[in-house]
Amino acid sequence: MVLTLLRLHYARGERKALLGNAQLCLKRGGDEREDRETNISCESALILLSLAIDVKNDIVMTAIVGILNKQAVAVAADSAVTVGGGTKIYNTANKIFNLSKGCPVGIAIYGNAALNSCVPWEVVIKMYRKHIGSNKFATLSEYMDDFFNYVRNYTKKYISDEDALNVLKRNLLHFWCVEITQGLRESDDPQSPIAKPALPILLDKLTKLGARLKKEKILSEYKDVTPEDFVKAIEEVLEIIKNQISANGGKWKDEFEAVVEDCLYRLSVTNNPFSRSSVSGVAIFGYGEDEIYPSLHEQQVYNMVLGRLRISPIPDNNTINETNGASICPMAQRDVIETFIEGVSNKIKNTFLDATATAIKKTVNDLSAVTRPHNPALADAIKGMDYSSIIDQYRVQINSIIRRDQVVPLIQTIVSMGKEDIADLAENLIYMTSMKRHVTPYAETVGGPIDVAIISKGDGFIWEKRKHYFSPELNRTFFDTQQ
């Protein structure tokens, strides 16, 4: 009965009711472990939580591009957001904002649309805008530091430890069901036990994953997160995994417990695809008070692990100065824009280079085989040749040609373009990405109206194109208060 009720809440998208009943199941499960039906309800509750689609949290935002020269910085963004892994797409998202009223500084958001998958970034940004008031900073880096200090304090004030921990549990369970045990369970149902013949395969998979993760350094933000504290915090998740493994005779204590705990711990505290799966990208662009040229800086904000928020800078060359007169900075879905910049897609380029390496390897092996009957020593020498340096040299040469013939001429042209021209270029790069998605047999994850903002030293933050969710003619008071 409880399980049916949970599924009904899940199907209707009733998150609040789902959470309430799930937590009740977890409490019952903690008190009555010997009751098999209660354990199933406990298990189902957490799995449903891990797979449930929450339109406020699981929103992924897509294409943004920034173009800079000595006159201005222009940033364009589409309006598409993808919900629940691509099951639903809306074309109404705002991704570009003025960070500080009256100051030439903007901010753009891509990736996860919510801080720690809890609070929409738009809410955080607009609260920061009130917080900063009329304060100004000498450099853009100082604006960025002040904003992220505010974000850290914001998470402590507005995101409870319980909510943050629920997000971590949900993500871990989702990763377990989709990436680890997919194809190893008795059925496609994520609640089903691990099939008995698949238990050795699962153990081998976990052992190899653990070995890879041990090579990764524990990130500095999580140095004080001990394995013991982590395991205690996610004990409900481990109970679910234990039940799945033990149902068909898996030896939890003897074989699986240590390796599962170690894998989940290291997945959460190292830099890997799991920890990057819910990342928000934040780009801050414009001018500090003492700067005459614009810049654009990106940071990645990760979900919290036991109360610790990780914010990581992305190395860039998007600061305009006397030696760097222009820059194009694609963010999120970069493939179409990078093809425009380089004249060839990275996918095609890498495929071509891989095919060349395969052809060289085959030629070496064929030459060795032909030589062997006549001169075995020479054949061995040929087969033992290290031709990786040839491939590396070839790769460097290809990249050099692309830069000389494609990238440099484009950047040199952008150096002398006016504000309106770089704004038009930014808009068209987003439009090209949208059109590419439109004519391919995949979800249209880039689309909708394109917003374009220009920031110059003299004029400050200017909207060239901006959508509204309301009619400006009917809401004059809104614009009056903005003044």
Residues covered by each model-derived region:
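Short, positively charged and aromatic/hydrophobic N-terminal segments
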Residues: H9, K27, L46-N57
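Short hydrophobic alpha-helical segments enriched in small aliphatic residues
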Residues: A11, A22, E32, E43-A45, ...
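Intrinsically disordered, glycine-rich low-complexity segments
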Residues: R12-R15, R28-E37
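Compositionally biased, low-complexity segments
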Residues: E37-I40, L46
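N-terminal nucleophile
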Residues: K56-Q483
